[in-house]
Amino acid sequence: MNTIIPLLLLSLLITVYAYALEDGNKEEIQDIAESEFEASNEMLQLAHLLEADRAETEEDRNSRQKRCWGANVPCEDENSPCCSPLKCEKTFGYGWWYGSPFCVRSGSG
């Protein structure tokens, strides 16, 4: 009888300890599962951001500024695509020396 009581007490302590470990393992497994779920959400958000960035890049590519004509390039009329500070004007010598107007700075001629 003296040996049975300590053995029963020891077995009781072992089972209580095992249940405590099992609860801890369940919490760890649950934490791991939650972190994996968060990682998949982050990947999904990243995919949406990349898709939006790709669409924005496509828009930028299609809305590129049209090429313009540089200085002293012959042009047809005032609607010609001369670069920003330049305008299509009839310069000195237009008609008797030059056959068409040129892209020049405004007021220089």
Swiss-Prot record:
UniProt subcellular location: Secreted
GO CC term, one of those recorded: extracellular region
Tissue and organ expression note: Expressed by the venom gland.
Major localization class: secreted
Disulfide bonds: C68-C83, C75-C88, C82-C103
InterPro entries: Toxin_22 (IPR012627)
Record keywords, A-Z: Cleavage on pair of basic residues, Disulfide bond, Ion channel impairing toxin, Knottin, Secreted, Signal, Toxin
Signal sequence bounds: 1-18
Gene Ontology MF, one: sodium channel inhibitor activity
Function noted in UniProt: Probable ion channel inhibitor.
Family: Belongs to the neurotoxin 14 (magi-1) family. 07 (Jztx-56) subfamily.
UniProt remark on domains: The presence of a 'disulfide through disulfide knot' structurally defines this protein as a knottin.
Protein name per Swiss-Prot or TrEMBL: U26-theraphotoxin-Cg1a
Organism of origin: Chilobrachys guangxiensis (Chinese earth tiger tarantula)
